[in-house]
Amino acid sequence: ERRANQLKEKGMDVIMHELLKLIEQVLDLGITSFDHADIYGNHTCEAYFGRALALKPELREKMELISKCGIKMATDYNPELDIKIYDYSTEYIIKQAETSLKNLGTDRLDLLLLHRLAPFFNPEEVAKAFDQLKSSGKVLNFGVSNFSPAQFDTLQSYLDMPLATNQVEISVSCLAHFEN
């Protein structure tokens, strides 16, 4: 079993070096924004990216790290859940931002997005979390993902800082955002 674990770890080292090469190639092409979310890859993608970045930490200054939060999936990460839920409480937003920072191995996120609008969304809770994360220097800018213009404006009215962006899903199979 010990040998199997050693081989597994050696394999992960190879994967992390390959991921680092990919990050460097992308940066060489002039692509500097890396868009993550706490839930991607069953909560593993940020940690893998962070492990690769730790091999060459000076690359951090050449990139913008983006993460999203607010969706809790029914996975091993949240064994208490039977269905996907949204959580935009002050505590959860801060907890997930801090988890992303830890997983990515950085002291700040350049941009934090709310992943999708929740049915029982409380903009005051979000504003409180954004204020705390901004004042602590943990997050430089904030935005949303897949909000309508009215929803964007509603949240903006509670904030003392401008929302930086509304990242919307658009593809051949998803054209709804062109309609509003």
Which residue stretches match the model-derived regions?
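Acidic (Asp/Glu)-rich catalytic clusters
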Residues: 27-28, 52-64, 101-105, 134, ...
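Active-site groove signature of glycoside hydrolases
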Residues: 101-122
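Beta/alpha (TIM)-barrel catalytic core signal, keyed to glycine-rich beta->alpha loops juxtaposed to Asp/Glu
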Residues: 117-180
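Structural preference for beta-strand elements that scaffold enzyme active sites
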Residues: 32-33, 62-68, 108-111, 139-143, ...
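A cross-domain feature marking catalytic cores of carbohydrate-active enzymes
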Residues: 1, 36-38, 67-69, 113-116, ...
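Short, acidic/polar
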Residues: 11-26, 86-105, 125, 150-154
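N-terminal binding-site loop/beta-alpha segment at the start of enzyme catalytic domains
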Residues: 1-67
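Active-site mouth loops of central-metabolism enzymes
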Residues: 1-17, 78-94, 115, 120-121
